[in-house]
Amino acid sequence: MTQELHIVGGGMAGSEAAWQAAHMGVDVVIHEMRPKVETFAHQTGNLAEMVCSNSFRSDDDEQNAVGLLHWEMRAANSLIMTTAGEHRLPAGGALAVDRDPFAESVTAKLKALPNVRVSYEEVTDLPTEGHWIFATGPLTSPALGEAIQRETGAERLAFFDAIAPIVYAESIDMSQAWMQSRYDKGETEEERTAYLNCPMTKDQYEAFIDALLAADKTEFHEGETAGYFDGCLPIEVMAERGRETLRHGPMKPVGLTNPHKPDEKAWAVVQLRRDNALGTLFNIVGFQTKMKYGAQTDVFRMIPGLENAKFARLGGIHRNTFLNSPTLLDHEMRLKSKPNIRFAGQVTGVEGYVESAAMGLLAGRMAAAEILGKDLPQVPQDSAMGALIHHITGGAEAKTFQPMNVNFGLFRPVEGLKGGRRGRKDRYKAYTDRAKVAWQEWLTNF
């Protein structure tokens, strides 16, 4: 029994993990609580049910990071990507799927494998023996959520995302912005320049507040009734409490001197903080929001220095369950306190169907290799897979860790290439060319 691989959760990650492990010759049991235990979002008991969008986003594997992830998954015999191709809908350069036939097909393919069994039952604890992958997604059941909290510590499991927008560093206008921590705090130069600052005049601030209050906003979905808590109040809710609230909160202008205009005191300052070790991504501090995406880009580009901002991720607050993976998981997604257990998918802090399935693919292969007594080299960081797993298991800042889509800001720079907009096409092609070579080389281990 201990040589079976148990996978809890039959979503994108769990289905992909099962497929990969089964094709390596390992016996797999998928534990899926639906339809016996329902969620507010799912409609069926099918595996890999898509409950939100039906899009896997861009399929461009030369100029887009998620398209590159598609390519890497296809190269690894991905169940999710193969089945998506079979049920593809017209969507321009994106990969959209007919969601019901897609889920039915994934379910049928897994059930047809002689070494895969689906057990429709809820798992409510973290076993101490056997090989397990927990891929329970953003709607992890309350009982299992409590078990994970007990094992990991309550402060390391979040039930609502407080997602601030993330901006590509190269798109920020540094002729208006500058690097400085408040009151120059810090022992090192890096600490004293940890924040990127965008100043506002009084007129700019008032116009920003007007736009913020008037912007289209989304409401909590049914089942997301816990409301807001002060630790992650949306900026528009803060603005509704008073026009000066933001100026005395995340946008307070104190302890900062604008080197571009040293004699002029800003009325308000928007701060951005480095979001990855490479310094290619910055998050807008305190700017979690329920504004609709189109409104976010319009409003946030009113910030001086961000007029041409390119966003790696837009903000939001919604129901989720995810670990502080940089603290809790090792480089193979094993729980450090219980290494017989791996986590995969959205619960690890990746965002999106494709990213979830990708982490399932890795977890399934890693768990199967462990069962078979096979050593694997680390996933190459220059691949999309490697950039993503490196981010969630150590590359991200643990104190501010939030779910992340795959994007080129997670990739190590390619030396000798132009920065900025003009060099972007060549730079992205260099990223994808390098990634494909690295990924194909890693696959030779199987």
UniProtKB/Swiss-Prot annotation:
Task: Kindly list the GO molecular function terms attached to this UniProt entry.
Answer: flavin adenine dinucleotide binding; tRNA (uracil(54)-C5)-methyltransferase activity, 5,10-methylenetetrahydrofolate-dependent
Gene3D superfamilies tied to this protein: FAD/NAD(P)-binding domain
Record's Gene Ontology CC terms? cytosol
Q: Which reaction does it catalyse?
A: uridine(54) in tRNA + (6R)-5,10-methylene-5,6,7,8-tetrahydrofolate + NADH + H(+) = 5-methyluridine(54) in tRNA + (6S)-5,6,7,8-tetrahydrofolate + NAD(+); uridine(54) in tRNA + (6R)-5,10-methylene-5,6,7,8-tetrahydrofolate + NADPH + H(+) = 5-methyluridine(54) in tRNA + (6S)-5,6,7,8-tetrahydrofolate + NADP(+)
The places in or outside the cell where this protein is found are: Cytoplasm
Q: Where does FAD bind?
A: G9, G10, G11, M12, A13, G14
**Which domain of life does the UniProt lineage start with?**
Bacteria
The alphabetical list of record keywords is: Cytoplasm, FAD, Flavoprotein, Methyltransferase, NAD, NADP, Transferase, tRNA processing
What cofactors are annotated for this protein?
Answer: FAD
**E.C. no:** 2.1.1.74
Q: Does the keyword Cytoplasm apply?
A: yes
A Gene Ontology biological process noted in the UniProt record is: tRNA wobble uridine modification
Q: Which family does it belong to?
A: Belongs to the MnmG family. TrmFO subfamily.
Described function: Catalyzes the folate-dependent formation of 5-methyl-uridine at position 54 (M-5-U54) in all tRNAs.
Spell out the protein name for this chain: Methylenetetrahydrofolate--tRNA-(uracil-5-)-methyltransferase TrmFO
Q: Which organism is it from?
A: Ruegeria sp. (strain TM1040)
**Gene this chain is encoded by:** trmFO
